[in-house]
Design a protein with these regions (language model features):
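Low-complexity, Gly/Ser/Thr/Pro-rich intrinsically disordered linker/tail segments
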Residues: 115-162
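Catalytic glycan-binding domains that act on GlcNAc-containing polysaccharides
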Residues: 1-134
Length: 162
């Protein structure tokens, strides 16, 4: 179903499906991390409710619905200039050069070999944090945001290699 949503959103907006899949991967491991961020970002594409409610972005859809949020992400990337310069669009999505680089890296992998999608969809989550890179294993779920320090105390196996 995710692949259909990426391709549908791509057809509707012109944003490459691989970029949408890569954003979804970086944001929530393609929906496997289900929670609200410390910044209050929500859903599979991690929208702030204020961004979601901008005219033409959420369009009355459900912030937690993969189909709705993937289409909203495509519209948001267009609004932020992604059709002219995808790096600029990604900067508008998350103002981090590392974020954009990671998304474009995964998008390039998907473009080179579309079957990579299957392995990325079922992979452990690699998460860049203030403490370094963490591994979030499949099924990771917290009802409330958790600080990196608390996460590492509870799950030391997620710690970055030293």
């Amino acid at each position: 179903q995710l692949l259909k949503a990426y391709r549908s959103a791509s057809a509707a907006t012109g944003i490459d499906w691989t970029v949408l899949a890569a954003v979804n991967l970086v944001e929530t491991g393609m929906g496997r991390i289900d929670g609200v961020s410390v910044a209050n970002a929500q859903g599979p594409m991690q929208f702030l409710p204020t961004t979601w409610s901008e005219p033409g972005i959420g369009n009355g859809g459900d912030i937690r619905d993969p189909w709705d949020s993937i289409h909203a992400a495509a519209r948001y990337l267009v609004r932020r200039g992604g059709l002219q310069d995808i790096r600029r669009g990604l900067w508008g999505y998350n103002n981090s050069a590392h974020y954009g680089k990671a998304v474009l890296h995964y998008a390039a992998l998907l473009k080179k070999e579309p079957l990579t999608y299957r392995s990325l969809h079922q992979w452990q989550i690699h998460y860049a944090s203030s403490a370094g890179d963490l591994w979030l294993h499949e099924g990771f779920e917290e009802p409330q945001p958790v600080s990196v320090t608390d996460h590492l105390r509870r799950r030391p196996y997620s710690a970055p290699p030293r």
